[in-house]
Regions:
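Short, intrinsically disordered terminal tails adjacent to the first/last structured region
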Residues: 1-17
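Helix-loop boundary and gating motifs at the non-cytosolic
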Residues: 12-89, 96-107, 111-114, 171
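Hydrophobic core of transmembrane alpha-helices in multi-pass small-molecule transporters
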Residues: 40, 109-110, 116, 122-143
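Alpha-helical transmembrane segments of multi-pass membrane transport proteins
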Residues: 45-46, 77, 139-140, 152, ...
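Transmembrane alpha-helix termini and helix-breaking/packing motifs in multi-pass membrane transporters
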Residues: 51-59, 87-91, 114-121, 175-195
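Loop-to-transmembrane helix entry/capping segments in MFS-fold secondary transporters
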Residues: 64-65, 96, 155-167
Length: 195
């Protein structure tokens, strides 16, 4: 092999490495943008649903004790189930699959929560809401360790603070806007216009 051929081969390998590095950087940038969008949509969901769940429970006939149970069970079970996700991660579970499945279930559980007054007898509605909201909290908290680990690997350390600052700012603004909009919509409904 001549010196020119060796030089050309070396240059081609370096070009290939550079192209692969650029492709990887593009993938990471795309993933980070998707994560910001995910944060915005999750905040919208929370602003619309989480903020008004106690009012929804009252509309379903919940007592003060039941409202306390609704929020306390969710706050108990949610973090407890993070421990089981840690065990799954230690056994080699895919962080991406764990997060995606839990997030999907977290969003889908809102459908039966909203359907409660239409499909269940009045005397069971609050109990069903408590169970479903506990599941909602479990699915919200369960992927936390996997998501944090995944994002820690994805976000370069030199831009981590700036990135999460931007993501949290956007999520906060979306939460405020959707909470206010949901409040305006709910204000329209009087007791005689519900269910």
């Amino acid at each position: 092999m001549t010196a020119t051929a060796e030089t050309k081969e070396r240059e081609e390998k370096e070009e290939t490495k550079q192209t692969q590095a650029e492709d990887e950087a593009t993938k990471i940038k795309k993933s980070l943008n998707y994560s910001i969008k995910d944060g915005a949509f999750a905040s919208a969901m929370g602003g619309i649903s989480d903020s008004y769940l106690p009012a929804y429970a009252v509309t379903l006939g919940a007592s003060n004790r039941q409202i306390g149970l609704l929020t306390s069970l969710a706050n108990l079970f949610g973090p407890l189930f993070q421990l089981s996700s840690l065990k799954m991660l230690r056994k080699g579970a895919s962080r991406k699959k764990l997060v995606l499945i839990a997030v999907l279930l977290h969003a889908l559980i809102l459908i039966p929560i909203l359907a409660i007054p239409f499909f269940f007898p009045e005397k069971y509605r609050v109990a069903i809401l408590i169970v479903l909201f506990s599941l909602y909290a479990i699915f919200a908290n369960f992927p936390g360790p996997a998501w944090a680990s995944w994002m820690g690997d994805l976000v370069p350390s030199k831009v981590r603070g700036e990135y999460f600052g931007r993501r949290n700012r956007i999520a906060g603004v979306v939460t405020i806007i959707t909470t206010l909009l949901a409040g305006l919509v709910l204000n329209y409904f009087t007791k005689d216009k519900v269910f």
